[in-house]
Each structure stands twice: as C-alpha cells, then as structure tokens.
Amino acid sequence: MRTLLAALHCPKGDVAGNLAAHLRLLTGAATAGCALAVFPEMSLTGSVDPATHPERLIGLDHPAVAALAEATGETGVGACFGIAERSRAHEPHITQVFAASGQLIGAQRKRHLGEGEEAFTAATHTVVFGHRGVTFGVAICAEAGLDQPFDAAASGGAELMLFPAAPGLYGRRTSEDSWRKGFAWWEGSALGDARRQARRLGLWIGLAGQAGATADEDFPGLAALVGPDGGVAARLPDWRPGVLTVDIPLAGSGVVSVP
C-alpha cells in the first residue's frame, strides 16, 4: 500500500492554514498514487493545551474535519490526521481521525497521556481500522513506549501501526546545533520504540511527526517506516518538514522509498 508519511509544520490554532496544508499534501499523495496519507498528532489544530487555550479545541463535527473527509473522496486517498478534540461531553481529547471515501470512518483517542498533557482526558478504547484490505491501528506519540496499544491493535488483526507524534522540545531551538540535539533525542526515542514494537509483534510501523517552530514550542519532525524485523526501511534525514512516500508490502515483497 503506497503511503505518504508527513513531517508537517502545524501552527497552533491555525485550523484554516493547517487544513490548506493537509489538502495540498492529500492532492500530492493522489498524484503519487498513494492509498493513504498519515499526518502528525494534532496536525489540524496544532498542539493545544486545554488549560490555557480551550477555545482551540474542535469537535469531530467541525467544518475543517468535514472538508478534509470530503477531500478523501475527491482524491481517493484515505487520511489519518490529528486534532485536539472537544467531545460531545465537553471533554478534551488528543484524537487521531481516519477518513476515507469522503466519510469520517472513526477516531482513536489517546489512551496514555504524556508529560504536560494532564489537562486532557485519557481514553480507554482501542480502535482498529481497515483500508484497501489493510488492517491498522494507531499509537499516538508517548503511547509508543507502552506495549498495550500495540498488543490491543495486533489482537484485533492489525498488521500496520500508525505512529503520529508531536513531542514538544524543552527550550527553544535557536541554532542548527540546538535543532540537531533536539532531533537526536527524538530520533533515538521514536525509532527505538518503533523498532522494539515492530520486532516484538511483526508489525509495520509508520511514523509522522510535527516539525518546526510554533509560537511557543518547537517540534523535531521525523517521518519513517519501520519493518517487521525492526529495521528502518525508509526515513527523512532530519528535523525539517517533509514528506516520505513509501510502498508498504504487506504481502512481503520488499519496501521502497518513492522519490
């Protein structure tokens, strides 16, 4: 399954601008022959702290969510994208949405919150999705360090895990050296977790992370594909925004990074 993994710059609170970026990448994914596009954690809203900016939370019925879902029908590319969600019960969740064929298919809310995410509400349920004959689950950022999200998805038949992330770096990145150091930390953490989980369960894992500087926080990027043997099959080289297009051969015929 040809897949676009996006390391995307996602300004906080700029839903309209982020939607435009998603739509451009979805169109590009269609041109490249992709069946699926994977965007980072909270990609549509940008990273949100509900304690300080509750107005930046959006519902699953928000017009931008509907517009992106509609675009999956127009392009023929399924999209897994992130929002900071206000649920119908008015609870704040970190949520990864999956849309395909012009419809909102479902959503995976984050079950295990990371440091600094205490203002969000943790979910309890695991969702397994199907697309183009491929069954997949989602582990959101800090969840990749825990076995439970992967075990639950694998028990539901998942052969692919999507790993969207938005790990805010401590301290601002003011030089290339400081960006390099922040990226080195995330590279070791994210790929270390992905490689361990892939080997343990024989899964493909696709990573897509927020990249670049926002108003008050910086993100280390990285898009990568890890194979069932734990090897890094393809990846972006550094912290800068970019896209990685890969063929994920779930029938077992090898993997290529597509220029």
Please report, for each region that a protein language model flagged, where it lies by residue.
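Extreme N-terminal starter segment of soluble prokaryotic enzymes
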Residues: 1-5
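N-terminal phosphate-binding loop and adjacent alpha-helix
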Residues: 7-24
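Residue-level recognition of beta-strand->loop/alpha-helix junctions
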Residues: 7-9, 40, 109, 209
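CN hydrolase (nitrilase-like) catalytic-core segments centered on the catalytic cysteine
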Residues: 60, 64-80, 145-241
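Short, well-structured alpha-helical segments in soluble
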Residues: 20-31, 152
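Active-site catalytic loop in hydrolytic enzyme cores
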Residues: 60, 87-176, 182-192, 239, ...
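Active-site beta-strand/loop signature of hydrolases that rely on acidic residues for catalysis
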Residues: 18, 29-56, 79-80, 143, ...
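Short beta-strand-to-loop element that shapes/binds the nucleotide-sugar donor at the catalytic cleft/hinge
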Residues: 81-86
